[in-house]
Structure formats: structure tokens, C-alpha cells
């Protein structure tokens, strides 16, 4: 019996180990107008305060909505929650629509994009100033690329069965170690996510206007595409940060990770210092370090813990270890009105469970570089027949198809165990549908989207068509988890909460900033 099989049998012995898995979804999407332009209107007043609303907020731009679900222990529930908040929001947006693709279209200039506004409180100004810094550092167009983030945690029962009886401190350390093992395996094998679910094989030519690229694009009118690409969002064209490439933050232990993160937020950047901190009285970045704050760290997966008020993410991790992980490699699924579907959630359940139960040796920088090379191949060439990937750095190679099949043998074993607990075959059905995509890459989301794009005559055309369909689906939707009254009450609560925060501020913003970054001194 392999170690993987042994560990799987342990956790599967307790039905609650899988039943109580925690999941949450964050979905980003741009508001745009009837004539296919980015919305210049403020955040819809009818959905409350973007600063304090639990489920409906904004990301980088005022027009970049973000929908957030609470933690749920049921796959269908988390999707129902997302459907309900989409319905509520679209009902308050007039004729505007939600852009159904990760890559923005019809946006070519930073000036087209208004930064997200959060009111006059110090914390609201801090959030907008942080975004001003991102704009000055990387440009606004990069920042309005949309994605879906999947938050995931194993149950206490899962850890009880896997780790046995332990003191509270030992359990905290063991759980953090196990999550870092998962994260390292995610870097090794997570290219499966863009292979199946990458949804940006093409983009509007306006997106790369004035930018240099070595990619050998083919064109279709104003659309640029790579014939075998899966996720240009995850490529060098997407949101990347050259200044971060030298950070080398270790994923081998929580202490090393926190140490690396602390170093990054304290390391001055010559390049960013040239931007300056203020223009007149206006703050234009929070500081001139490599990272203004920890959230600026670009990563396809992050270890997380819910922070207490005033606590930095790394301080929360240091206090009590890893609570959950945030998967950040999902493109928006253009074929789903909510940007993600049930098969994607179930695959991530299977894959993340496999990643934590499979051996995961420590990883050095050179090994990480080899795995990143595989990701780059998949995002640019993922559907190419016979594409070979590296197995580590020893020169051994395997086709993406053969490698995916190896992993899928193990995933099927997990699917059967999960289905046995739930009394259905939902995970095996997902496994079967994705197995067909291994055999035929054109069944993947990127394969289907590129075919539709060619048929329609351009990515902008297909984006507008899907947006109209999805808007109607949202308007036709009937509440299935929340009620309208509950969401109305959350709007009122959020507006009141913002007013209370603004009324309680006592110090000028410059003083507040000095105090906030006192830990850097």
C-alpha cells in the first residue's frame, strides 16, 4: 500500500472528514455599458458600501465588482450564494452588463479606469491610495484582469484522522506544514488547472497596445490569439511583477515564509522610489518598498488565516498558523453566468485533497524554476498534442496527457471515497467529464472558447454575446439561498457601518499612514 493510499484510507474512515470541508468563492467582473465601453459610473448605490458590504465589493477599479461568498460546507450552497448576489447586483445596475471574460476588452488607456473609491475614512483612503500605487507601478490595464479565487480548508475531522492526537501547538504546526506541502505540490502539478479551465486563449488587440511581446500571435480582426494557449491571463502578458522575481519567498515552512514576506515589505525599491510618495498633498503610493503591503505579493496560491482587526496577514499566520488556502489560478469561466461551475469546484476538492495526501518534499529555487517552466508551457501551448513537460529538473520528460492520466488515477480513488460519503456519484461524474478533456483538449474551456471566438469573428463579439445572455440569466434567477430582504438589510448595514467608521476617525490621513506603517520603522 502506498503512503497516499494509506493516508486516504485514514481520513475516509470518518465521513465528516470530507463532509465538513470549507469552501468560499470570490469572483471579479467588470461592469460595462451597452456600447461595450467600460462603465464610468460609480459603484451602484443600491448594493451598499463597497468598504463594508460582506458579499459585494470592488477590487482595483470602481467598475471592477467582486462578489464574495461566506464559508460553506456544501458545493451547491456556495454556488447558490454566488448566483443570488449576482442577481441582486445586476438588478441594481440598470442596463449595464458584467464582462464574462478574464481579459478586459475595449480598454487601452490607464485614464479609462477610475480607481475604486471607499469614502473619506482613513481606511477607505488607504485602500484607494494602495490602488493608486499599483497604477503607478504596473499600470491600470493590468489591474483590471479578472479572476476567480477559491478559498479552501480541510475539516477538523480530516486533520484528526490524518494527524492523530496532538497538543494544540503541535496540531497548529502540523496543519501549517501539511498546507505548505499542498502548496508545493500545487506548484508542481497545478498546471492542470489552466489546462482544464484556462479561459483566455485570445484577447483584444487593444490590451497590448504599446507593449512589447515576444509571443507569436495570430490575428482575427482585432483579436490576437495563440492556437494552443489556455490562459494568457497567467502568462507574462497577465499580471506579473518583475520587481518580485528576486524575492524568493520560501514555501518550506511557515517561519521561512513569514520571514520572506516581512523582508519583502521592508525592502526599498529604487524603481518605485522614483515615483515619489506624494504629488502636492495627494498620496500616490503607500511607500516605496518592493511591496506596499503584503497583498501586493503575486502568487497563484496563498496560505491564509482570517485576521483580527488591525492585524496584518503575516501576523495572523504567525499567531495561529494556516487556516485555509486561497487558489488564485482560475480564469473567469465565460460559459457560466457566475464565472465558475460545479465541475471546477469538485475538481479543486479532489486535486487539493490529493495534493495534501501525496508526498511533498521541500523545494529549492531551482526546482521551483523548473515547475514554473511547466506552467508557462501550459498557459501558452497547453492544448498542443504531445506537449512535453519536465519532471523536476533531472531532464526526465512526460507529455501533459500522460502526466494528467497518472494524477487522474489517484483522483478517481478520492472521487469514489467522497461519493461514498455523500451517497451519489457527483465527483466521479466530474472526473469522467474532465478525463474526456485529457483525451480531447478541444473540450477544455480554452478550446471551446477559441472555437466560438473564430466562429463569431472576434473575442470582443463573443464577450458581448455571452454578457447579454448572462445578464438575462441573472435577471431571471430566483433567490435560492438568501432572500431579497436579507440582502436589502446587508445594504443598509453596510452603509451605516461606513458612516460609523468615518465618524470615528480622529487623525489626519498622513498621521494615520505613519501610524499604520510604524512596524516598518
From Swiss-Prot:
SUPFAM superfamilies: Glutamine synthetase/guanido kinase. Pfam families: Glu_cys_ligase. Keywords: ATP-binding, Glutathione biosynthesis, Ligase, Nucleotide-binding. Its EC number is 6.3.2.2. It catalyses: L-cysteine + L-glutamate + ATP = gamma-L-glutamyl-L-cysteine + ADP + phosphate + H(+). It comes from the Bacteria. One of its GO terms (molecular function) is metal ion binding. GO terms for biological process: glutathione biosynthetic process. Pathway: Sulfur metabolism; glutathione biosynthesis; glutathione from L-cysteine and L-glutamate: step 1/2. One of its GO terms (cellular component) is cytosol. InterPro entries: Gln_synth/guanido_kin_cat_dom, Glu_cys_ligase, Glut_cys_ligase. Belongs to the glutamate--cysteine ligase type 1 family. Type 1 subfamily. HAMAP family: Glu_cys_ligase. PANTHER family: GLUTAMATE--CYSTEINE LIGASE. This is Glutamate--cysteine ligase. It comes from Aliivibrio salmonicida (strain LFI1238).
